[in-house]
C-alpha cells in the first residue's frame, strides 16, 4: 500500500498541512501512522477518509461534528452526496477516490452521472479538465503513481469516444476541415478528443491523427487532406518552457491557420502570430466554433 507524507496529503486534498495537524491535535481526526524510525505517514485508507471529510466539510458539515462520526458513517454520507451531479467539488472527490482505488465501476458511474445531468461540455469544463490538471501535477510531483493517471485518462478517453459516436453531425452548407493532432512529446488526448466532439456537433469535418505526430509528416498530410485549420492541444508540463517553440515548429510544417488549446496556453505567455488562435478555456473553444 502506498505511503503519503503530509505534504502529499496537502496536495491531494487541497487542505494546508497545519490545518490537517490541527484536526489531528484537536479532534484526533485521521492520526498518521509512524514508521519504526518514527516518521509520520498516511496510507490509502487515510487518504480516502480525508477526501471524504473534505467533501462533507465543503457541504456544510462542521469538522467538530465530523470528528464524532465513524469512517463508515462519513463514507455513507458522502455516498448520499454522490448523486448531486452538479456539485463539482463532490464529483472531483468521487473521481479521486475511484482513481486511487482503481475502481473502474465507480469512476465510470461518476462520469456517466455528470454527463447525463450536465452534458459533456459542462462536465469537461468544471469537473474533468480541473481533475486531470490536478492529477497531472500530482503525478509529476510523485504524490500519486503514473498508473493512477493512466487509469483515469484511459477511462475518460473511452467515454469521450462513446460520446463522439453518439453525436449526429448536423448538415451545414460550408463545413470546415480540421486536422486534429498532438505534436511530438505530447501524449494526452483528452482535450483533442473533446475538440473532435465539439467539431462534430457543429457539423465540421475532422481528420484525427492522435498523439506524437512527427513534424515532417504534417506537410504530407496537409497536401493530401487540405485542411482549413490545424488544431493541437498542449498539456504536458515538460513542454511548458518550450511551448512557443513547439507552436512555431507546428506552424512551420503546417502552413494553415492553427488553433491551440490546453492548460499550457493559459499558464504561459503565447507569442502573437498571424494565423495563430490560442483558445484558453472551454468557453473560448465553444465561442470560436459557434462564430465560424
Language-model region placement:
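A short, Lys/Arg-rich alpha-helix, primarily the initiator
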Residues: 1-10
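Residue-level recognition of alpha-helix initiation/capping sites
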Residues: 1, 14-15, 47, 190, ...
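Long amphipathic alpha-helical segments
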Residues: 12, 16-168
